[in-house]
Every structure is written in C-alpha cells, then in structure tokens.
Amino acid sequence: MPWAGYARPIAPVLTAFAETAVVYDRFYSISSYTAMSIGGLLAGRYPSELDRSGHYFAHWGDVLFFPEMLRRAGVRTASAQSHFYFDQRSGFRPAFDVYEVVPGIEEDHQTVHGITSPAQLELGLKMLSDPATVKGRFFAWLHFLDPHDKYEAHAGIGPYGHTTRDLYDGEVTFTDQHVGKLLDFVAAQPWGARTVVIVSADHGEAFGEHQCFRHGFELWDVLTHVPFMIRAPGLAPRRIDTPRSAVDMAPTILDLFGLPKDPAMEGESLVPEMRGAAAPARDVVLDLPRTTNSDRRRALIRGDFKLVAIGDDDAFQLYDLRNDPGEEHDVQWTARAKLDEMKAAYRALSAKMPAVCPSSREKLRGKKSHRPC
C-alpha cells in the first residue's frame, strides 16, 4: 500500500487516513485464507484450535467470538458482509445483534463474481443510520471484498495496465473510494468524533511470487503481511514497527470497551502501546490448518526471522526478513544456531496449540493415517 512504500498511489483515502492513525508496519493476518483468518480474529485464537467443519470451515456454536462478549456487556453489534461464505455457513451470525449479507451474491468456490462495494456501502450506511444500532455503545464490522479475484476493471480508474496486478490495483482504488464515503459518513455523525475506526485485512494476494497466485495455500509474507491502522479519540498518530498479529485484535477491541479478554484468547491488547507505551517483542504465529485443498502450514516470526513448518513439521524453512523480505533464500543451512532457536520456540508454542480435528470428516488432502488432523 502507498503508506507502506508502494509507488503507485492506489489508495489515496486510506493513505490520508494513515496520517491520522496509529499504523503497524509489520502486522500479520492469522492465516492466508479468509475463513481461517476471520474465525481466528473473532475468537482471538488460532484456527487450528477452533471446532469447525473440515471443508467449508464453518464454526460451531461452542466457539466464543468477541462480538458475543460485547453483546453480553450491553454493546450493540452489527455486521455487513459481501460474500456467500458469511451467510449461514460461517457460524458468525449468532454473535451479532444485526447481521446482513449483500443480497444476490453468487455462490462460487473458485472465485468471486460481480462488484459488491456499492451494495456493501449501501448496506453499511443503512446499519449505521439505524438509531437502534448507534444510540449507545456499538461495534460495527463492514467487510469490503472487491480487491479479490476475479479482478474486474472499473470505469474511471487508472488505467494502471492490463496485468492481473494492474487490475487488482484498480480494485483497491475502487474500494478505497467507497471506504472514503463510509469514513465521510462516520465523520458527519454526532457520534463520529467519539468513534474508534480500525482498518485491516484478512490476507494478502500473490501475483507470481514463489510461483503462487491468489491466496490461501501458503504463508509467504505477500499473503499474510496486511495493513492495521487505528484512529481513536486522544490517540496520537505514530508508526509501530514491532511485529504484531490479528490474534491481538479481539483483546484490543475488548480493552477499548473496558472489558477483559477471555482466558482462552491467545492475543494481547495493543491499547497500551497504541497510547505510547513501549511495544515489547513478541512472537507472531501464522496458522494454515490442513483442509481439503492443501496440507498444513505454520510459521513463527521472531524479530527479523521467520520459520515455516510444512505439513506435520516434516520440513522447515528459515528466512531473514530484513535482508530478504521476498523470502527467496532459505538460510537454515547457514544460520544453524538461529534455526535451532526458532525450532525450539516453535515446538514449545505448538505444544500449547493442539489441533482440533474438524467435526466433519471430509478427507483432508495430505492426511496421514496415523494423524487425526
């Protein structure tokens, strides 16, 4: 994105927003696949830990999501979505007082058809115009999906070019315009000045890096390094370079409402460091459970190094992100001490993060007969 050094000015609204916000320069999604990332974000846990279906990654009622905790504390919760997964299948609906999906969404498990930002904006503005939603404390989650394959050209934007990356950039600009209209609406409301606004994403996108396209099958930084910006009353704009993860989002939002996190949550509140406290170093964990589409991947980020575990820890890769941000050179053979340190830390962490088997027994690709998940 432009505020992170991308040369093409594809998101002027969010670039201006970054000047008024606390910006995390090394923020990671929990996974590289929407259902896993969002489930983990809402639960404050890793997707491997959550009871779920093995194919659609539907979450069952015993998974506690932080919006449900807000509801119990008297906070009104609302969500507007623009993909068929977020309808009945995801299991997120019961955590919200108001939960709506853009009508007419086509169900396709390979790609996304159509343009939804205008309808998503309309749905979000309707929710935020309802006095029942905004008369007291409220939490609203609006998920814009248009920067997503299938990439569409948009009239009046660019032209940036005709490659898939060019089309994707145009989709970012198109969505940025609609997010801008949403932010303008919020700013004009009587409650706007006392409202916290958070901007983030559930995964990145690959355009040929590591011979990968789209997302959801690996844990490269191009798939997991995402924006995280927060603007709040009394919060001075600043940049934070310490690695952090979306697993911290649930404890952070609960803290902003004055509520403690659930004991099962893995993340920590970022509120103290947002307010100026030092940001202590913490490991970041990425988790891509085995599914019907791909084998398991996990990764551990500690400082400038990233350890990737493949399958049931059958193989490892080690990258120096400061000197090799594109993760092109595996340094495990030349940095043996660092490899041993990272593997020990990873195994200790994995021992505390057991994998819950999917409740639906679809055959999982790469599943070994002696391994339940």
Language model feature labels by segment:
Residues 1-373:
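Catalytic domains that recognize anionic headgroups
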